[in-house]
Amino acid sequence: KLAPIPHPAFTNGRSFFDVIAKRDVLLHFPYHSFNIIPDFLREAAIDQKVTKIRITIYRVASQNSSILNALINAARNGKQVTVLLEILARFDEENNILGAERLRSEGVHVIVGVRGLKVHGKLCIVSRKEHGKVRHYATIGTGNFNEDTAKIYTDHILMTSAPEITQEVLYVFNFFKNNFKVPRFRELIVSPFNSRDAFLEKIKREISNAKKGRRA
């Protein structure tokens, strides 16, 4: 059994914000260490320039989760922390409810799902004041922010500060609070709004490429 490795982008104690401001970083679990995610949140919790943290949590690892602890520390340090916690996650309902209660008791704003939908997206966005403007740093993943399952499940997380992507991540979080208004997406594929059409379009494109003898 091999131990997970650190990502080379984050060696030598470099700031997550300094790295992600310059380039996107793709993490591949369980081969990369999941510690990168709670470490990113810990840095955000103590960074004086960070004003807000928004995150979706589908399955709480435990009541002593490093993710929960980092978010609570951020709230204690005066950050505005919003957590979309899906209490309908199968077999984890009780654990998630307890997690929601703990977060609320520490001043975290908790949204317990969206009426009529199950939120399965894995998103986090940190807002930071830089040079008189607000810059956003997002993580978009296929797997839960869960340090236990990250050891055995194969997943990816993209860390990015690209404005065209982070703006649409903000649209998603705004929808969680005001779900009467459905945003339009250009970069993100978001169910149940545009995923079917987006995937059909991509399939048709590859069919067309194959017919023309192109790589498909």
Predicted ranges, named:
Residues 1-216:
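N-terminal localization/anchoring segments of enzymes in phospholipid and broader phosphate metabolism
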